[in-house]
């Protein structure tokens, strides 16, 4: 009764806002005070007290109870009426923090801007407003506030500097690393773990792992975050060796790796192509008793796809189910790719169909799986399904999707379809990336489609991809294969950091078009530039020697491969030297090389020797080679037709007819080759038998005119006359 009477009397002199608030707080389910009368009396006593400490605890308690914007603003009103906010930086800081927690950034900023100037020297106030901005992604605002703070002569402390360093990291202001590092040293915070860890995180983002390592070594105290930052930093630099050294050092210092540590180690080895090591470290992670993260599983399954290690992936698949990672899409998508790449597309599709909310990454995983398994029709069907789903669930094909489809068509020899999908991709306003561009340039090189290749080159320049080494190499290859070596050479010379592929592309280009001396010159220049030639480079230069008839130079390169370059000749190299010797008539030497090969000769080697026998009408060697080829390629007609032509050239018509009859008896059919020609930006495809009778009268006079010009040129470098092959031109 006493409390009730007192409440009725004092209610009359408390402002209406505060009365409402008293009732509001008394009804709050989280308050520990059950009696509204007690709350009201306590409230009034606190408001009329001159004890700042009591007021602070009272308002701080109320702020802790606030769950809504209305409640927080009512407490704010009480604080303003008490004038206490102008005396307490701590209370203002707490009020800012509560507003920020509720997402009311404008209210938080309003509190900060209305405090007295005296309180602006309180670092707690600055910390609260900076934290409010950084936690809500307003990084520019945070940096602007920090500049204002510095202009007032204030220096950041161990709470403020980590916030500013985090803002710099997210904004990409990596150039400020050194400035803040100096500031940390000047204000004596170089031993503050939170500050140094944030600085340690910023350096790798700036690509300055050397500075990060020096800072790390100087740290008197480290925690697990310090070690993880360094391992992840080296991982992003593709420096597996350094990442492993830090990882081993961490364990020597008795820090146990956690999920973040293991995931960084796995990612590092995966990015560096050290797939076997990924399996090793994944096993060690499981043996250590650490919980396996979804990210680690995604990396592991991606590596299983690369290694085609389906059996290993299947064992861990059970862990995914038991560990509750089935709904974690990155690991599920990687698992889809594992099954798909191994040809188990039904299992891959089953996993895909189980996903309830499919993102574009899931669609891409299955489409890529179909493409890798050579099931192009299924990939295109799924792509069409995705296009239809776009209208239902707003999942749209991205650059990865389009590139997979374009690549799939190209691999299956459907270059025209690839270009059509590329046009559709452009129409859909999806920007091509470097992988897409390289794929299209490869198609342009194979068709060839020079005009489109030039258009792509223009696109590369406009989109600032001209410094991408993959794109530059693809351009060199495209121009070289299309016969425009002058343009290819210009692109090649413009490459600042040439790699082995750059050199191989230009050497091959010169060689295939008969510029052997230029190809050899570029080969020597490559070696003098410090590059060690690989097998592809040696194939290119040997092929150049073959086309130009440079026998001695070709012999020199071939027989010095092992001693000079540390490379043992492979099938392709043997094919080149056999072709070189065979073209100039050294059939016996070429035949001996084939007989003495350390491995069984494959089709490329035997085919080169058989073709040389055709050139020089050598039936004896040809018969044995054709017999070997028919065993290696029982369903191909090539060796039969070549042997038949050799018999015909030697006047042995009966044997020629017998060979053709044998091919017919085995029901072997010649697969017609196709050719493309580009006229006025339009490509035309034609093959043997595709020309109708009415077009003969137009085509053959032109063909005969070309042959007559070739005959006037006389014999080729290998001593053969074009007239010997006239039957092939008119067949």
UniProtKB/Swiss-Prot annotation:
Domain of life, per the record? Eukaryota
Name any one GO molecular function: RNA binding
Question: Among the record's GO biological process terms, what is one?
Answer: RNA modification
Q: Where are the PPR repeats?
A: 88-118, 122-156, 157-191, 192-222, 223-257, 258-292, 293-327, 328-358, 359-393, 398-432, 433-467, 468-498, 499-533, 534-569, 570-600
Q: Does the keyword Transcription apply?
A: no
Region (Type E(+) motif) residue ranges read 681-711
Region annotation (Type E motif) maps to 605-680
Question: Which keywords does this Swiss-Prot/TrEMBL entry list?
Answer: Repeat
Give the UniProt family note: Belongs to the PPR family. PCMP-E subfamily.
Protein name, please? Putative pentatricopeptide repeat-containing protein At1g17630
What's the name of its gene?
PCMP-E72
